[in-house]
């Protein structure tokens, strides 16, 4: 018969052997995972290791801020690819999704911690707004079109050359004035 105290000592020893002298793995090599120390100190990270992404009780969670032109262009290109490759659908290419997620999270790491969740919200709203605008333009040119149905490439070429679409990644885009947001 083993006592509970002895059992927990054995578990403690196992964790200690796995993680050196830090039984709960204080290693910086924990990737994007939150260590016990992170949790206790409030340094919570998303799955990519980015702090400041928690939306719970965060006043910045639905705030539009200025974001880099490079990231706006990446979001625009992602929407464009979704229309050319997948007829306005998101597609199923995990490598593309992962590459975009990595790019966004690397960008967030360059920002102040308190701006990161707002930047994520802003880029998400830019993606939604651009997608809506393109979908409405497609529906004007191809009556009866719905997401997933084929779109002639010449129609998409015309839409993505239109200044009302391209201006979404320049000028005031990424600011409150530049986004057509419906919350």
Ranges and model annotations:
Residues 1-183:
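Type III/flagellar secretion export determinants
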């Amino acid at each position: 018969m083993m006592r509970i105290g002895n059992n927990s000592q054995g578990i403690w020893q196992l964790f200690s052997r796995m993680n050196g002298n830090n039984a709960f793995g204080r290693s910086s090599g924990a990737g994007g995972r939150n260590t016990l120390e992170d949790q206790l100190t409030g340094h919570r990270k998303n799955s990519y290791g980015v702090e400041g992404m928690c939306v719970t009780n965060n006043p910045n969670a639905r705030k539009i801020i200025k974001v880099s032109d490079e990231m706006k262009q990446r979001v625009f290109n992602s929407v464009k690819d979704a229309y050319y490759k997948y007829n306005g659908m998101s597609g199923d290419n995990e490598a593309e999704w992962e590459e975009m997620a990595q790019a966004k999270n690397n960008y967030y790491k360059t920002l102040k911690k308190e701006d990161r969740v707002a930047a994520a919200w802003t880029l998400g709203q830019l993606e939604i707004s651009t997608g809506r605008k393109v979908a409405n333009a497609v529906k004007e040119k191809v009556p009866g079109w719905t997401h997933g149905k084929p779109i002639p490439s010449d129609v998409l070429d015309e839409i993505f050359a239109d200044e009302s679409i391209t201006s979404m990644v320049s000028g005031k885009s990424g600011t409150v004035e530049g986004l057509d947001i419906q919350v």
